[in-house]
């Protein structure tokens, strides 16, 4: 399967809040999104984790 499931973790509280998919051939770098963290109760940077 070309698309791999990845999780996005909050950089402030380290909670893993979101899952998404990505094609590792097209985007070899780690993904970063500004998303809402329900534990911090604000928008924070979420980075790709294992």
From Swiss-Prot:
GO biological processes: translation
Signal peptide: none
Superkingdom of the organism of origin: Bacteria
GO MF terms, alphabetically ordered: structural constituent of ribosome
Disulfide bonds: none
GO cellular component, one term: ribosome
Protein keywords: Ribonucleoprotein, Ribosomal protein
InterPro entries from the UniProt entry: Ribosomal_bL33, Ribosomal_bL33_CS, Ribosomal_bL33_sf, Ribosomal_zn-bd
Family: Belongs to the bacterial ribosomal protein bL33 family.
HAMAP family listed in its UniProt record: Ribosomal_bL33
Protein name as catalogued: Large ribosomal subunit protein bL33
Name of the gene this protein is made from: rpmG
């Amino acid at each position: 399967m070309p698309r791999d499931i990845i999780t996005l973790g909050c950089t402030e509280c380290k909670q893993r809040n979101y899952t998404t998919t990505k094609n590792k051939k097209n985007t070899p770098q780690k993904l970063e999104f500004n998303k809402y963290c329900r534990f911090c109760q604000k928008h924070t940077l979420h980075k790709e984790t294992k």
